[in-house]
């Protein structure tokens, strides 16, 4: 089995996969530059085991060492092992066992990649445990955008970060988080 999660004794292949994810971050950064964005202020990224999130965080932290973007890692609420580890504040890995009922099947992992956790626990600004309705909202908004924007077809796992951003920006109960993250018209 080739997979992107790592544990003691199985780290080489997950590290290669994370390098590939880092290339995706570089390509996204290149597109931002082509569109006139000097540097991103925020990055919202989904996480299951955290490999994609760790690679993206690592890329942007290295690319913009003096002014890295604020990174928000979004997990399925039912499997939020990274969120639980960050909330504990002791740097230790947390595992979510048992059933993880969620529509975000790609994020229902419950156990962090040990390589990515070392990156994420030290560099991520905010971890979010998103309920299913947030991912569903993200899917709907991406599929039916405002006039002039191109529709995007996304599954639940991919739409979770967009739904999270939309909720933070539009819902009064997330005003404190919005202010904490510094999300405004200049973001």
Give residue spans per PLM region:
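Active-site-adjacent helical/loop segments in soluble small-molecule enzymes
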Residues: 112-184
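Glycine-rich phosphate/pyrophosphate-binding loop at beta-loop-alpha junctions
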Residues: 7-122, 178-187
């Amino acid at each position: 089995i080739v997979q992107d999660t790592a544990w003691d004794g199985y780290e080489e292949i997950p590290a290669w996969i994370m390098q590939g994810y880092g290339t995706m971050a570089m390509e996204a950064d290149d597109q931002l530059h082509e569109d006139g964005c000097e540097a991103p202020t925020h990055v919202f990224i989904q996480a299951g085991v955290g490999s994609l999130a760790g690679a993206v965080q690592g890329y942007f932290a290295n690319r913009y060492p003096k002014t890295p973007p604020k990174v928000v890692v979004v997990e399925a609420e039912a499997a939020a092992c990274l969120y639980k580890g960050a909330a504990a504040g002791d740097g230790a890995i947390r595992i979510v066992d048992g059933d993880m009922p969620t529509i975000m099947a790609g994020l229902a992992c419950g156990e962090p990649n040990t390589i990515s956790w070392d990156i994420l626990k030290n560099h991520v600004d905010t971890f979010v445990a998103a309920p299913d309705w947030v991912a569903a909202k993200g899917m709907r908004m991406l599929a039916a955008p405002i006039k002039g924007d191109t529709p995007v077809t996304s599954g639940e796992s991919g739409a979770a970060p967009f739904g999270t951003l939309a909720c933070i920006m539009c819902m009064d109960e997330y005003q404190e988080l919005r202010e904490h993250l510094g999300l405004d018209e200049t973001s």
